[in-house]
Amino acid sequence: MRTAPSLRRCVCLLLAAILDLARGYLTVNIEPLPPVVAGDAVTLKCNFKTDGRMREIVWYRVTDGGTIKQKIFTFDAMFSTNYSHMENYRKREDLVYQSTVRLPEVRISDNGPYECHVGIYDRATREKVVLASGNIFLNVMAPPTSIEVVAADTPAPFSRYQAQNFTLVCIVSGGKPAPMVYFKRDGEPIDAVPLSEPPAASSGPLQDSRPFRSLLHRDLDDTKMQKSLSLLDAENRGGRPYTERPSRGLTPDPNILLQPTTENIPETVVSREFPRWVHSAEPTYFLRHSRTPSSDGTVEVRALLTWTLNPQIDNEALFSCEVKHPALSMPMQAEVTLVAPKGPKIVMTPSRARVGDTVRILVHGFQNEVFPEPMFTWTRVGSRLLDGSAEFDGKELVLERVPAELNGSMYRCTAQNPLGSTDTHTRLIVFENPNIPRGTEDSNGSIGPTGARLTLVLALTVILELT
């Protein structure tokens, strides 16, 4: 009686072995793949071992966390045929060795898990199929497609009396995974303090406990320093720079004169403003990153570099944003040079303004490359603008139906960015218009009371002659 359980156990093991022999032997494994770059050819290998007769091999694309399996390729051993289920992909995959699928140009959308299912016939009956499967994760990388450096909160005015914070934004798009972004100044990496939140706009100059290193010996222009201090002395003595009240008799240096754009414009005065304060230490930089996923699976990275701007040191400084990414063979880079506006070029149309014309005065560039984008303010020296306003913000000043009274009037254009400010003065010469009798227009360029009375008399004369 005691031997009965042992006998039954032996019989069960024997039957299991017989069933295994009947079903056949089948194991499946897929070789792991390192991350691949979009556009490369990828081969998914499904290795299997069996002593049975193969029925089919099916590849699946797994989506939605494994809840959906999309059949992408099938090899039917019964009919020795294979066909694609990826109609939307226009049969991009090829079955190389019955157990291998090749994607000639992998895409970011191909990223994700895949499964290979292999089926063999049961040896006991051909109506049953024994299945085994393996899985692999295809990690598709994509290098960044664009990089750009811009200034935040621009255009912005130049601060003459106090320091202000300045932020450069490096925008990197199209990368997967997110790239590493960092800044350099004049070719040297910037040791920045990481920030998780943006600094408050009203927090004042940014500070850090780390020791400062002086930059005066490296970047400060003694000429700029002396001129800045001379302007400060003039202000303390009660005087003002001539650029704020230009004189009609002033003859500026011909080297800085702009070419006149209309006839008989006698002078164009260019000035440059400098700050009334000077820093003597290297600024502390603060760096903050943000990441925004895109619908195509890539990530947009924004790196924000903030520091307390010092125009004496930062003007003409070269800042570069560099990107490192596993899909790039070398870093990606974008550069900007911080430059204050200098020597605005003014174009006036028409070239010969007459009474009643609409005159346009446009800033048509600078003598240098300016960054960040400047803001423009127009004023009329000694009076208000034609429309009665004190000033106008914009790149182009439009004077509609100019009257003769504007002949000889001077206009000031102030171009400024956080690095500095420059003033340009130009004089408007208005010529007589033979189509408009002298004295018949008012200050707005329209027909005045005298012209109206003359028109009325002529009309009455014509009516009387007709009657």
UniProtKB/Swiss-Prot annotation:
InterPro entries: Ig-like_dom (IPR007110), Ig-like_dom_sf (IPR036179), Ig-like_fold (IPR013783), Ig_sub (IPR003599), Ig_V-set (IPR013106), Nectin/Nectin-like (IPR051427). It is found in: Postsynaptic cell membrane. It comes from the Eukaryota. Keywords: Cell membrane, Disulfide bond, Glycoprotein, GPI-anchor, Immunoglobulin domain, Lipoprotein, Membrane, Postsynaptic cell membrane, Repeat, Signal, Synapse. SMART domains: IG. Glycans are attached at residues 82, 165, 407, 444. It is a lipid-anchor; GPI-anchor. Disulfide bonds join 46-116. Residues 25-132, 344-429 form the Ig-like domain. One of its GO terms (biological process) is synapse maturation. Its main location: membrane. One of its GO terms (cellular component) is inhibitory synapse. Involved in synaptic inhibition in the brain. Selectively regulates inhibitory presynaptic differentiation through interacting with presynaptic NRXN2. This is Immunoglobulin superfamily member 21. It comes from Homo sapiens (Human).
